[in-house]
């Protein structure tokens, strides 16, 4: 199964609380921090919500 490599590229300053909570739930804290998550609809939805703040790459498991 494929995985998603998610990197925080933009600051959370001035963003809505909802967007901040979504980034925190993805496990991202600082700019350029990266996490690898399973590719599933829940994670895709979270990424879509903050797509302007993150960079996503698909990686093989």
Swiss-Prot record:
Does the keyword section mention Ribonucleoprotein? yes
Q: Can you tell me which residues the record assigns to a coiled coil?
A: none
Annotated GO biological process: translation
UniProt KW keywords? Ribonucleoprotein, Ribosomal protein
Q: Provide GO CC annotations from the record.
A: cytosolic large ribosomal subunit
Q: Name one GO molecular function term.
A: structural constituent of ribosome
Q: Which residues cross the membrane?
A: none
Q: Does the keyword NAD apply?
A: no
Q: Which SUPFAM superfamilies match?
A: Ribosomal protein L30p/L7e
Assigned protein family? Belongs to the universal ribosomal protein uL30 family.
Q: What is this protein called?
A: Large ribosomal subunit protein uL30
Organism of provenance: Brevibacillus brevis (strain 47 / JCM 6285 / NBRC 100599)
Q: What is the organism lineage in this UniProt record? A: Bacteria, Bacillati, Bacillota, Bacilli, Bacillales
The gene that this protein is the product of is: rpmD
